[in-house]
């Protein structure tokens, strides 16, 4: 398992033209299959007058959750070339949607493959590629009297607090780079009265 992965920073767009057909490509970061599907649906609705809305996505640091669609184009001429660009750039947590406006001239199988590949590539290159750390969460409980010690670790390590509850027995869930969680687990476990939940 890798602690790092590459994705795009935000939405980026590329436009490829071939024989009067226009290919509008959009690359967008996503964190789940559901989010990718929502993005695909949004573009399909927005560009409902287009001939085709082809797409591919890759999810997860292991890059093992992926899918692509030719959306009516000949099999293997759209979705696979889009997915191929995701693989070429070694990206994950990304969806690329390519909208085709047909220009009246057929491109043939090889022409379609080139067009969808180039459109996807242009969308990726138009954006910024980020190298991100895989994130993990750590949940624990602690007595209220240990609050200062817990907060010192949180501030010193610049941790993102996801959830917290304060009472006689307090609870907290933090998020950090996955490779730092084992050391943080030890730090929090060393604070008097602290119990690690997960």
Question: What does each of the following model-derived ranges do?
Answer:
Residues 1-76, 163, 190:
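C-terminal regulatory domains involved in ligand/effector binding and gene-expression control
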Residues 2, 161-178:
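Non-DNA-binding regulatory cores of transcription-related proteins
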Residues 32-33, 143-147, 175-182:
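Helix N-cap motif at beta-to-alpha junctions
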Residues 78-125:
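Active-site beta-strand/loop microenvironment that shapes enzyme catalytic pockets
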Residues 128-144, 172-174:
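Short glycine-/aliphatic-rich beta-strand segments at the starts of folded cytosolic domains
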Residues 140-159:
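Short amphipathic alpha-helix segments
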Residues 150-156, 183-192:
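Short amphipathic alpha-helices in soluble, non-transmembrane regions
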Residues 160-165, 191-198:
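Conserved short beta-strand edge segments in small beta-sheet-based binding/regulatory domains
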């Amino acid at each position: 398992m890798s602690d790092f992965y590459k994705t795009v920073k935000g939405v980026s767009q590329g436009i490829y033209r071939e024989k009067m057909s226009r290919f509008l490509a959009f690359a967008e970061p996503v964190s789940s299959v559901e989010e990718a599907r929502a993005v695909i649906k949004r573009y399909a609705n927005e560009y409902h007058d287009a001939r085709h809305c082809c797409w591919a996505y890759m999810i997860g640091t292991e890059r093992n959750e992926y899918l692509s669609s030719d959306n009516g184009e000949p099999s293997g001429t759209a979705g696979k070339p889009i997915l191929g660009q995701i693989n070429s750039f070694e990206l994950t947590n990304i969806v690329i949607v390519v909208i085709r406006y047909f220009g009246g001239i057929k491109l043939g199988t090889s022409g379609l493959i080139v067009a969808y590949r180039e459109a996807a590539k242009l969308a990726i290159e138009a954006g910024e590629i980020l190298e991100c750390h895989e994130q993990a969460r750590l949940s624990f409980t602690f007595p209220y009297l240990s609050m200062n010690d817990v907060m010192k670790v949180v501030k010193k390590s610049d941790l993102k607090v996801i959830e917290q509850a304060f009472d006689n027995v307090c609870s907290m869930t933090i998020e950090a780079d996955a490779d730092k969680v084992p050391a943080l687990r030890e730090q929090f476990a060393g604070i008097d009265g602290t119990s690690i939940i997960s």
